[in-house]
Design a protein with these regions (language model features):
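Extended interaction regions within the primary functional domain
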Residues: 7-8, 35, 91-94
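Residues that flank catalytic or metal-binding motifs in active/ligand-binding sites
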Residues: 31, 47-49, 85
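Short flanking/linker segments adjacent to small metal-binding domains or redox-active Cys/His motifs
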Residues: 76-116
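Short Cys/His-centered divalent metal-binding micro-motifs
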Residues: 24-28, 49-73
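Short cysteine-rich loop/turn motifs with clustered Cys
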Residues: 2-31, 53-55
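Short linker/helix segments within small regulatory modules
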Residues: 36-49
Length: 116
């Protein structure tokens, strides 16, 4: 059984309470987004989940679910046949990372525009 509270804490700690799409601070009411969608076989694991504002998740015009092609290019959505670890995520500050099973960023390219 998935421990959602624990997963939320791990993801929130990793992103330091910033939205992993827009870079603005998160409130208690944020979405855990499956990069590899559950409909594509995605798992409820810290290395497959990112923290997003609801408008960045599925409510806003620039949300990942309304812009699948762009979200796939930036790694916010992972193709069905890809492993999330092997499909880098572009953070709002321009850094490119892999998400680890320990709940950390593995930096491929690091930029410190937001202090991440």
């Amino acid at each position: 059984m998935t421990n959602w509270k624990h997963l939320r804490e791990l993801v929130l700690a990793r992103c330091e309470a910033y939205c992993e799409k827009c870079g603005l601070g998160l409130t208690e009411d944020f979405a855990l987004h499956h990069r590899k969608l559950r409909s594509r076989g995605g798992k409820d694991t810290v290395d497959n989940l990112i923290a997003l504002h609801h408008k960045c998740h599925n409510l806003g015009t620039n949300s990942v679910h309304l812009n699948i092609k762009l979200a796939t290019e930036t790694g916010h959505i992972v193709p069905r046949n890809a492993d999330p670890f092997d499909y880098p995520l572009q953070l709002p500050n321009g850094s490119t990372v892999r998400l680890t099973v320990e709940g950390n960023y593995d930096y491929i390219e690091r930029k410190d525009n937001y202090g991440w």
